[in-house]
């Protein structure tokens, strides 16, 4: 059964691509374990704004595990310790009361940091715009690209899903 927990966050903060970054520590109290990880970051940002501080910059789009924009390192693992899930599919029930959670941007030469947890995905976006894709075996369920879908249909589907989460 989900309950409310208190967590300490160590969040990577970096003002720009050429600036030095550092970890900042924040305390969040009464976080419902049924909240998604991104909802928890939204709550942190609301708290920071109320305190007159800059919110943590992070990227997200679909919040459905499709787009990959929310990619983060959580406690040293891509997307957190859960396997087969993206950051937006991670829920706070994976954490315990009193846990310290370290949150870092996706670090790769191909994805330089823009600010805080947001990285420049333009190299990846160019591949996608050119019609490229990556086939990855995700386990027991059929791969998402097992049935070929024409690019035009996929584009229309993405347009229809663009408002989700807003």
Ranges and model annotations:
Residues 1-165:
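Signature of N-terminal electron-transfer/Fe-S-associated modules in redox systems
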């Amino acid at each position: 059964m989900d309950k409310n927990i208190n967590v300490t966050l160590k969040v990577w903060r970096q003002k720009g691509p050429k600036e030095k970054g550092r970890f900042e520590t924040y305390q969040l109290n009464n976080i419902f374990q049924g909240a998604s990880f991104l909802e928890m970051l939204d709550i942190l940002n609301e708290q920071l704004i109320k305190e007159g501080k800059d919110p943590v910059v992070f990227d997200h789009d679909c919040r459905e595990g499709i787009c990959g924009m929310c990619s983060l390192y959580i406690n040293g693992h891509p997307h957190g310790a859960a396997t087969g899930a993206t950051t937006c599919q991670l829920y706070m029930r994976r954490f315990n009361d009193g846990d310290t959670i370290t949150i870092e941007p996706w670090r790769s030469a191909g994805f330089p940091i823009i600010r805080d947890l947001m990285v420049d995905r333009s190299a990846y976006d160019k591949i996608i715009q050119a019609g490229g894709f990556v086939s990855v075996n995700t386990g027991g369920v059929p791969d998402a690209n097992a049935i070929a879908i024409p690019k035009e249909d996929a584009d229309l589907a993405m347009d229809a899903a663009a408002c989700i989460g807003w």
